[in-house]
Amino acid sequence: MLTPNVVPDFTGLRVAVVGDLVADHYLFARPGRLSREAPVMVLRHCGEEVCPGGAASAALNLWNLGAQTLVLGVVAKDFNGREVLRQLEQGQIDVSGVMPIDDWVTPCKTRILGSDSGRTMQQLLRIDREPDVLVRTEVRSAIAKKLASLAGSIDALLISDHGYGLVGPEVAKAAHEIQEAGAVCVLDPRGDFSAFRGISAVLPNLRELGMATHRQVEDLMSHAALAEAARELLCRNGPEKLLVTLGNGGMVLFTRDEPQGITVRAAGEQAVIDVSGAGETAAAAFTLALAAGLEGPRAMRLANAAAGVVVMESGTAPCPLSRLRSALPNAPQPSQVSQPAPVRG
């Protein structure tokens, strides 16, 4: 029996990630002078890098935490797609399920970070380069077929949807087959996820919860409103666990047994440096914790601790196992919210 402050051994777990592979592109700069062309600052370029983002970031987190990791998705035959694959392969992640496709651009999020010398880089601007069309149906079907073939051979599946069209009914059908074969299946959603009814867990942020329940974020700011929306999803879409991530507000876990919610405040005592990739880190850690047999509240605490590690770093940084082991003993403990209400349906 593991004590609450011990991270389980994830090395025996085989985990697949399916979803939208993204390139996170960082441009680093130092302030120079005011421009004579416009009332803006001229920045002096001092470096850049491309990191795996989206589902690729989730895969890197799983691997860094010790799991045997497979990734399924698509990339374009462009520099960003090749670079994302190169870095995944460098980490000994199985990318045989990734399809390079024509008539596509690998989604790329360019973040410009700047600061004075000796200070922490802060994000100044983000520019997104996205494909003009969604992933084609025949490509989705091919990926889903590969995914379904993993049923019975993996311990967990993490579905990372960033809205580029890969995650659809075909992937949902394959996910149900994998879950029926005994694996934990976790969805990090974007928009409607009714096709994933009965899945092990869904991890929306506040905006995604609002999209799924047709509510504005402003209407979800009280715990009562949040719990009402969560109960609606538990009834309608029926995930076993609903973990709502609230940024610096922490996380709230809802289940049919705990419809009022179990909360945990955000981990980390320092000022947040960069939230890029924190969602993927939390999803990866939560998936592994469930696959290792932890109950929902303990899995949430571990995911919160992992997210608290990466927000202290600039860029899309995965959470190393050693850092998680150091952070977990100091991570906040979950607490129940005494606002019970029955879940029906």
Where are the model-predicted features located?
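Structural motif
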Residues: A16-V18, R126, D155-L158, V186, ...
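Conserved phosphate/ATP/ADP-binding segment of small-molecule kinases
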Residues: Y164-G261
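Conserved post-catalytic alpha-helical subdomain immediately downstream of the catalytic base
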Residues: N237-E240, V244, A267-A331
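A short, aliphatic-rich alpha-helical micro-motif
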Residues: F10, A151-G152, F196-R197
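Conserved N-terminal subdomain of the carbohydrate kinase-like
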Residues: V6, V15, A23-A156, P318-G345
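Extended, hydrophobic alpha-helical segments in both membrane/secreted and soluble proteins
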Residues: L158, A174, A183-A195, I199, ...
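Active-site metal-binding loops of divalent metal-dependent hydrolases
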Residues: L21, H162, T281
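Flexible glycine/proline-rich, aromatic-decorated loop/lid segments
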Residues: R33-A38, I199-R207, A212, G250-G279, ...
